[in-house]
Amino acid sequence: VTKYLKDKETARFENAKQDVVQPGYGQYENDEDHNMQESNSVGQTSDGTSRYAKAGGYFIYTMKTAPNEDNVLEVTFRGADEGKSIKISVDGTVVYDEVLSFSKARAAVSDTDEYTVRIPVSADMIGDKTKVDVKFESGKADEDSAAAYNFIYMTKAYSTDTSLELTSSEGTVTKADDKSYTISVGKDVTSVDLTAKIA
């Protein structure tokens, strides 16, 4: 079941994906599609790929969108940047301005852990545009920004809920915990039809 749910989640993501850029890997940042513009930013390829803006700096990627639809910008951060800020704008409108807090993102992390933030970009903001400029900079003018790691994605908005919904032809189904369900039926019931559906 777990593999099936993971495959379903991956399929939803792939169907929704509009664009991807690999920060820190110049060949993909500077291609015709993404046309990176930057001032005082640093790309790295030593431990995965990443890019961050030095104090007062920035970097911008042109990214494809789904016009007239809600989109989502997916950015990966690391625990090593705990307490650093990052401000992200789409065509000049700030969509994310946060100080990274891994204690909020995960209960237990190490400095090599990564997590992905899904940032809504509304259909009103996108309008009929097929491309937007996505700008990354520090939220604090006198400090370096947090780094964006590995890949930055622009997707159509999609559901990430892969929970199971179970129904029974007889009795009731209750979720016991994250991995099990209980089916309660009358003592005279000899068989039930069980239907499983992904949310």
Language model features: what each stretch is:
Residues 1-158:
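Extracytoplasmic
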Residues 158-199:
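Beta-rich interaction/scaffold domains
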